[in-house]
Amino acid sequence: MEHSSWHALIKAQLPEGYFGKINQFMEQVYSQGIIYPPKEKVFQALLTTLLEEVKVVILGQDPYHGPGQAQGLSFSVPDSIPAPPSLQNILKELSDDIGVKKSHDLTAWAEQGVLLLNACLTVPAGQANGHAGQIWEPFTDAVIQVVNHLDRPVVFVLWGAYARKKKALVTNPHHLIIESAHPSPLSVYRGFWGSKPFSKANAFLKETGQEPIDWLR
């Protein structure tokens, strides 16, 4: 992370010494039990999607907490792992909106400028939201603020009540916010189905002179 285009700008948004606190937290929790994603993938979203490449931000809450699922990109799992229910619903909405994506590994989105960011970057095995409120939210809020300050228009995709609270951090009128219910089976019928976030994002990117995302990759 230190050598990425993100580092200095995120650091400037945080209190002095906050990166050190994150390192201490990670050393502690990874030494005490099973934590997801693997330590080397905690910052995968920022390493795969460089700041100068960001076109879309899709905000999740925290990583998947089952074996082999989390890979440091919100909602994504490796193709060797069955797609969790929320991801199944995302891919169904994509199919209805644009077409069928055969892979449920979303790395190809990240490589095209889709920042797949979780608000909390680690989770204990089997404990959803187990690290919520401990260290990560100021860091990931800083990431959102760094993107908000870009002159280049960016699409923020906010699914569910938790992500929609982050709308307060997106104050730049150049950007587009797409919000709906969460793709979880518990809430998908409250406005996620038929929300067409993928075609809406691409329409905005084209309008602002940017290459659209190939969501089917």
Swiss-Prot record:
Active site feature: 62 (proton acceptor)
UniProt-listed InterPro entries: UDG_fam1, Ura-DNA_Glyclase_AS, Uracil-DNA_glycosylase-like, Uracil-DNA_glycosylase-like_sf
Enzyme nomenclature, EC number: 3.2.2.27
Keywords: Cytoplasm, DNA damage, DNA repair, Hydrolase
Catalytic activity field: Hydrolyzes single-stranded DNA or mismatched double-stranded DNA and polynucleotides, releasing free uracil
Pfam families reported in the protein's UniProt record: UDG
GO-annotated cellular components: cytoplasm
Listed SUPFAM superfamilies: Uracil-DNA glycosylase-like (SSF52141)
Any one GO MF annotation of this record: uracil DNA N-glycosylase activity
GO biological process, one term: base-excision repair, AP site formation via deaminated base removal
Subcellular location: Cytoplasm
Function: Excises uracil residues from the DNA which can arise as a result of misincorporation of dUMP residues by DNA polymerase or due to deamination of cytosine.
PANTHER family, sorted: URACIL-DNA GLYCOSYLASE
Stated family: Belongs to the uracil-DNA glycosylase (UDG) superfamily. UNG family.
The protein, known as: Uracil-DNA glycosylase
Gene responsible for this protein: ung
